[in-house]
């Protein structure tokens, strides 16, 4: 028996209904901010990803050659593809551009809870805006999208300018190692490394910055910075909305990717793989041959959101089970079509079993049953049975439809 590939999943109808419902809530949340959906190919030229991340990323991707010998890769994320599309197709459009996306991505990594080889991202890119308002908007869009799902989470906001200031006088290799320790939250290891590297003087300011809970505490460590005004303005805009967040000036992800504001969000019940969103301000368009378009964006790990939510109660729609004799089947198709035209789900029994057996099957899922026998065919009516109360009445097709609709309210 052929099995599905490792790191992938099958979704049965109940799961898909839950996923579509949460996806729909997120789509509606970002739509209210003016974000419009875009889509890119599932596979891209390999260089799209290696030109920014280096050749080392190849081991983490699904890479192949097509019949023309071109090196291609299944997309491991969406931002690079969306910026490639901007450079190819949309540089002349009026900015800022508010784009959103929902799509599957692929990474060759060890599968575990909340981490898969095929996974879905929901995200936005705000292209062509370089202000505190742009930073605040994208954070709020992410917060709205996540909270629309019903998930409570912890939002952490930082700014790479403060950490870069403290590390301005160290070499690139040292900076990378410091950020790697911070990213892994190996603070004891960081202290030992700084002492070994002759940089013990950095231990105190780094420790104080990591412990800072307010902007005043953070700038007391760094002193005045050119970015301070923008950071404080962003904070004022966020505070005006009442959004719940805290500061983390030790966010070290994407040092070579993000240019200023960064943020992350963590579910409270996922353990080690608890991060559900990451984003920030960046400038990538030039890397792909475009103009220097400042951008802000985020990506939500949709699968982790679903894991964190647990069992999702979907909105149950009314179901009508249509049962009939073999002779009454043409009329049954007509009746079922009338319900569907009115927006009601109608399930036809396709077996040749008797009416009793068909009715018993319908009662397992349907709210109403429509019985069609010789009498109903002759009179052009139906027998409508409420499966919750057991009452049944001979009515016209139109009245049956109206009765079910009224019972759905």
From Swiss-Prot:
GO terms for cellular component: cytoplasm. Coiled coil: none annotated. One of its GO terms (molecular function) is histidine-tRNA ligase activity. GO terms for biological process: histidyl-tRNA aminoacylation; L-histidine biosynthetic process. The keyword ATP-binding applies. PROSITE patterns: AA_TRNA_LIGASE_II. It catalyses: tRNA(His) + L-histidine + ATP = L-histidyl-tRNA(His) + AMP + diphosphate + H(+). The keyword Transcription does not apply. Keywords: Aminoacyl-tRNA synthetase, ATP-binding, Cytoplasm, Ligase, Nucleotide-binding, Protein biosynthesis. It is found in: Cytoplasm. Its EC number is 6.1.1.21. It comes from the Archaea. Belongs to the class-II aminoacyl-tRNA synthetase family. This is Histidine--tRNA ligase. The gene is hisS.
